[in-house]
Amino acid sequence: ALHMSAQTFSTDRRGVLILSHYSCSSAGTVVAKLSGLQKVAYPLQIGNRAIGRVLPVGDEVTHVSVGDLVFSHIHHQSHSLGSQLVCRIPDELDRAAASMLGMALVALTGLQTAQPQLGDTVVITGAGLVGLFAAQLASLSGAYPILIDLVDHRLEVARSCGIQNTINPIREDAKAGVMTLTNSKGAEVVLECTGVPTVATSATEYAGRNGMIVFVGSPRGEYQTDITPFLEKVHLWRSGGNLTLRGAHEWKIPIEDNDFTRHSMERNCNLLVRLILEDRLKIEPLVSRVYDPEDVAQAYRDLSQHKDLVLGAIFNWTNYHQ
């Protein structure tokens, strides 16, 4: 249930107090924590992505001002101190869908890790929020995405965002489908966005020789198997072999721009905002439902039990501003 309490915030020299407008949870990390699939200590504050307005800021803060609309990695609550990334975004994005920027940031890190070339095929396993953004970003990069998921509704959302090639393994052989679409060569890149170990180890089935598998989704749950066939697929010089494995955790890149790295979370946030405003990156079709924070229990039931209908839970905090 929603917990109401008075809280005093103190902004230090670099602190930013944020009045939340909309916050977002996907069906991944938070559900894994609440279900016990990912071990965490309680009590636990949940949620880590939201947009809102800047209230007081510390004396050394220069990148945002009072009244700015910002995205930040903050909890599901009406007021929060900005956490690490606080990125100013245009007022045009003061809407529920923009709270999903954080999921697009995860996907973009995967694309930047893989660095697909113009004309490459990119297989994306998992059509949750991250996978749906990854497929769109792959297409924007000049690659040909193939999106694989067990849920027809998710693939319908993908097609509404312009992703033409989708595969449901329940209805067809996924490997055969990928090979048909790649003239039997396999994909240059596989982005594993589910975090499900069985899906991760089967990702080699979709890769072509010298291909790359990038782990975007965080792995969870126990999985016992003979790992040798997977390692052979990665190691041996044969069709679909000699593969490169790379991790693409969201936090692998710096938060702020600097002179020594090409990518940062700040730069990525600004890039995604630009793509959204240019209507090149679709976000509205990915909104399943916007919840009142009072309905948090229902929201997480929907995320865990109705993945066929709910991609993510967005909470509207605008009725809790005082």
Segments from the language model and where they lie:
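Local beta-strand N-terminus motif with an aromatic residue
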Residues: S83-L85, G119, I163, N183-A187, ...
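Glycine-rich beta-strand-centered segment in the early N-terminal region that forms part
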Residues: T8-S25, K33-H75
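NAD(P)H dinucleotide-binding glycine-rich loop of Rossmann-like/cofactor-binding domains
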Residues: I46-N48, H63-A127, L155
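C-terminal substrate-binding/catalytic core of Rossmann-like NAD(P)-dependent dehydrogenases/reductases
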Residues: K175-M179, I227-V287
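Mid-domain Rossmann-like dinucleotide-binding core that forms the NAD(H)/NADP(H) cofactor-binding site
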Residues: A97-E172, A176
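Short beta-strand "acidic-cap" motif of Rossmann-like dinucleotide-binding folds
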Residues: P145-D149, F215-V216, A248
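C-terminal capping/lid region of NAD(P)-dependent oxidoreductase domains
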Residues: S184, R209, V214, Y223-Q224, ...
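Glycine-rich cofactor phosphate-binding loops and adjacent beta1-alpha1 units
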Residues: Q164-R246
